[in-house]
Amino acid sequence: MKKLCPLLLILFALYGCVQTSNKANKKFSNVQQENFDNMLARNRDKSYRLGNKILEKEFNDSVKLAIGEYMDSVKLFINWKAKIHNINSMELGESVKLSFELKYTPEQYREVSFDVDYLLSKDSLDSDKIYNTIKRLNNYSTVYFDGFIRREANGEACYSSYSDDIMHSYPNFKFFVVDINTTSKGDILSDNLQYAVNLSFKAIEPLELSFKKKMSDKETKKRIAEIAPQFKTAKELLTQEEKEYVDRLTQALTYNFLYAE
């Protein structure tokens, strides 16, 4: 028994080191944000090992498409943490364009940015959650946000940065924001809201396919007629704040295919 005691102490000490190491290696409490950032870090590391411009272009194009496909898989980023920068607004006729950037810096010499343009009517300035949250913030404030990366017409992720030379170390994505808060709300949506969100993506699909001339008008109307009653019932189960969340999401999803280049 006396021989076992030192051994147990060593094992406990090693276990404690492993636990501490795992926590130290984690950059984010949000698992979804951690996984996405790890993917970006791997892409950055791979980009350093490419031997010529042809390989670089092929790799960069594959990354843009892979991130677009990644967004098809995860649908929404939920409760990600970042600093807000460059808050601004501009009047456009009867609308206001709110613009800002969301940035996080996971390590030295690497920064991830999301470039947001949020359009709303002047009539909704007093009631719109995004606008009223943003206008009370100072630049560099910490925020928690939901949303998704915009995509090009070919399915690639849409970048704001003009040079592929920095797309791995300093990626800057064009982004649709759906929710923003000054405190964490948790990384999981309520069951009712998640169901309505899933239906939102399902409902927008026939509209997008019709817009791209990939679905007939007859099939589009049929698909919409099938989804509409489910969507209506799902929204009736939501709180008012959740209904507004879904409205912002469906608007962003519509803009995503209408203005894809």
What feature does the model see in each segment?
Residues 19-261:
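OB-fold and OB-like single-stranded nucleic-acid-recognition modules
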Residues 1-4:
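Positively charged n-region of N-terminal signal peptides that target proteins for export
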